[in-house]
Regions:
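Glycine/Thr-rich phosphate-binding loops that ligate phosphate moieties of nucleotide
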Residues: 9-10, 14-212
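Positively charged, low-complexity/disordered segments
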Residues: 1-8
């Protein structure tokens, strides 16, 4: 499971490709925390079902600043928190908040990149173990208001390295490889007002853990 995530936005300047990179300290590892430390789940696969069972009106936010916060906050002294808990908040709601915080952090990066570059990101192309979680991928699409494009292969880094080696050796043809990957697509379905209200709640939760 991932302990960190990278979000990259590609720009082409003078026939060269540049990648604007953003690093997150805690994404998939928050699920490991739920399993190993809180004992709320026995496997990551349980999280999707629990998230779907959670009360949709619950406003619990989990900020996983266990080792501070990375981009775009860069606050190594920030501390983790769970806020917005009510009497009806239970295991399902906490698990849902843990999944949601992954999507919120990526949304922070996407919005920062769009603001810094003046370029709109139309689509997120994602990989890694959490992409198998349908609830998380739909929420990621909803909260960013972006199409989320997921390859059938979970770990693209290894595949990409093999493809590059094969292309360099003349074994593979780039054009043919480009059409080999099958993908699933999630489209945003959330109302704009609801999206901004949820994201504002996340920003308020983050503000509460920042050291400065």
């Amino acid at each position: 499971e991932m302990s960190a995530s990278l979000v990259g936005s590609e720009m082409c300047i003078r026939d060269r490709d540049y990648v604007l990179e953003g690093n997150l300290n805690y994404t998939g590892a928050v699920i490991t925390w739920l399993k190993d430390d809180l004992k709320l789940i026995s496997s990551a696969k349980e999280t999707e079902g629990l998230a779907r069972e959670a009360n949709p009106a619950d406003r619990t936010y989990l900020v996983p600043a266990f080792t501070g916060l990375g981009a775009p906050y860069w606050d190594e002294k920030a501390t983790a928190s769970i806020s917005g808990i009510t009497r009806t908040t239970g295991k399902a709601e906490v698990v849902k908040a843990a999944l949601d915080c992954i999507a919120y952090q990526i949304t922070d990066l996407v919005r920062a990149m769009e603001q810094d570059t003046g370029m709109r990101i139309e689509e997120l192309r994602v990989d890694g173990g959490p992409t198998r979680n349908g609830y998380l991928m739909q929420f990621q699409s909803d909260i960013t208001n972006k199409r989320v494009n997921i390859p059938d292969a979970e770990e693209l880094s290894g595949i990409g390295a093999a493809y590059m080696a094969g292309i360099s050796a003349g074994v593979y043809d780039l054009e043919k490889l480009a059409g080999n990957m099958k993908r699933s697509v999630y489209e945003p379905k959330m109302d704009d007002e609801i999206r901004e209200k949820k994201y504002a709640g996340w920003k308020k939760a983050v503000d509460g853990v920042l050291s400065k």
